[in-house]
Amino acid sequence: MTARIIDGKTISAELRGKLADEVARVVRDHGVTPGLAVVLVGSDPASEVYVRSKHKQTKEAGMASFEHKLPADVPQAELLALIGQLNADPAVHGILVQLPLPKGLDSNAVIAAVDPAKDVDGLNPVNAGRLASGLFALTPCTPLGCIVMAKQVHASLEGMNAIVIGRSNLVGKPLVQLLLNENATVTIAHSRSRDLPALCRQADLVFAAVGKPEMVRGNWIKPGATVIDVGINRTPSPDGGKDKLVGDVAFAEAKEVAGAITPVPGGVGLMTVACLLVNTLRAACAIHGLPKPAV
């Protein structure tokens, strides 16, 4: 059998459409325009492209977009002072500091400085703790997108066996918490787990977020399982041309076994910005004491 392709382009477009409707309603009914501030330190080309995409999609959703660009050699104190200003700015409901930061800056201190109520990346330790405690929290965007995509295939994840390969603070750990909140049975694994293929073969849901190109092979997949590939890896093209993007899953092999699978590119990556905007709207509503939006 050939797996159903879970199309990130279509799903993210639908989500952004619903989001724009909710933003328009909040603006109309409550006079609140959600605002997202993005802080870019240095001039990393990939980060600049990502920030431009965020700005464009933020405006298209009807939100206010604020960009702050700082040189790579900015002192830590100056960066923290900017975050303090954004924390106090009533027009800003979401703050995202583009990672990774240049050498010499303490990422943990910067993340901790963002007001948890405006931490739309969901990385502040307060939000991580709230999520682990089953309380309302702004959640990292990529895990949020993974859940949305899994629910395109399964109306409920309750009782399903899920494996998360990868234990990062950005994806693996929060994804485990979200799956537990959905009443899935979760195994968390990583590159040093023993007999990882056997663990994968038991899973109805496979989430690969380990950062190793095509590590998860087709014969690791349980027939009919749903595979969500978070990896984005550049590998040399066999013909010497441009590098190609591949995931953490060997797509050509896995799609012959899985029931549904996300492609790379065109999968989870497209959901990340859409979920960032969802978090910004949720933050704006929470800050103003409004009901949780319907997205």
From Swiss-Prot:
Entry annotated with the keyword Cell cycle: no
Biological pathway: One-carbon metabolism; tetrahydrofolate interconversion
Keywords, in A-Z order: Amino-acid biosynthesis, Histidine biosynthesis, Hydrolase, Methionine biosynthesis, Multifunctional enzyme, NADP, One-carbon metabolism, Oxidoreductase, Purine biosynthesis
Keyword Protein biosynthesis found: no
Superkingdom of the source species: Bacteria
Gene Ontology BP annotations: L-histidine biosynthetic process; methionine biosynthetic process; purine nucleotide biosynthetic process; tetrahydrofolate interconversion
EC number: 1.5.1.5, 3.5.4.9
PANTHER family: C-1-TETRAHYDROFOLATE SYNTHASE, CYTOPLASMIC, C-1-TETRAHYDROFOLATE SYNTHASE, CYTOPLASMIC-RELATED
Protein family: Belongs to the tetrahydrofolate dehydrogenase/cyclohydrolase family.
Function statement: Catalyzes the oxidation of 5,10-methylenetetrahydrofolate to 5,10-methenyltetrahydrofolate and then the hydrolysis of 5,10-methenyltetrahydrofolate to 10-formyltetrahydrofolate.
This protein's name: Bifunctional protein FolD
Organism: Rhodopseudomonas palustris (strain BisB18)
UniProt lineage: Bacteria, Pseudomonadati, Pseudomonadota, Alphaproteobacteria, Hyphomicrobiales
